[in-house]
Amino acid sequence: MLFLSFLLVCLCEEVRMLNLMTTEVSATEFASIASKNMETDVSTSSDYLTGKSETTFSANSETWGKNVTEISIDSETYLNQSFMVTSTLAVETTDRSIGNNVNVTSSFPTVKGDETQNIETSFTVISASTFSDVSEKTPQGLSTKSTPKKTVQALWETDTVQVLEFTDTHEGDEEYFKDFLSSLVIWIGGISFIGAFVILIVILCNWYKKDKQRSLFWDEEKKPDVQMRRDVKTCR
């Protein structure tokens, strides 16, 4: 019964994995809000099949000042925790008059292969600088302009997205089926070994009990009173 249950679980897992491997994955879209000290909305539209990501930073004019003049973005992309790409995406300028939006397009490794992959992309806002015009008067009464710089630093990370295999063929199915059969053979061998061991223990226990009973019987037969009764019966 236990073995049949195990086979049923393995079969269900096989069907589930095959369904995952042949599922078509559309562009993954998600939005998030940056950390509070950044005070800006960040929205991202990512297509993990083509390896393109577009990020829009919507600046808060009250926090950032009149003009947002510089935003420097850094991106780190992790592929299965073994491959990392670090690149500076853009140094863009924007103005409140055009909506304080900075569009950044990034690239990361295209999803390939037969296995499900985890891709984690994080965007780090290195600096968001603002300049404001301030009228000052010198001792001579001449008006000058200064541009004090305000820098805001924050870290924003996207969610970890699990990307399923996107393929028109079943190249990975054969390899997975071989691995599945190998695991199944190992499990069957292990369960068979354990079952044989248990059966052997039961046989040895039964043999020991019978041998003990046999020894007790012969000990009982060898007692003097038993022998005398047997001799009396023989004489009669």
UniProtKB/Swiss-Prot annotation:
Membrane-spanning residues: 184-204
Q: Which residues are glycosylated?
A: 67, 80, 103
| Keyword flag Lipid metabolism | no
Q: Point out the signal peptide segment.
A: 1-17
Where does the record place it? Answer: Membrane
The annotated topology with respect to the bilayer is:
Single-pass membrane protein
GO cellular-component terms in the record?
membrane
Transmembrane helix among the record's keywords?
Answer: yes
Q: Which UniProt keywords apply?
A: Glycoprotein, Membrane, Signal, Transmembrane, Transmembrane helix
What is the protein's given name? Glycoprotein U23
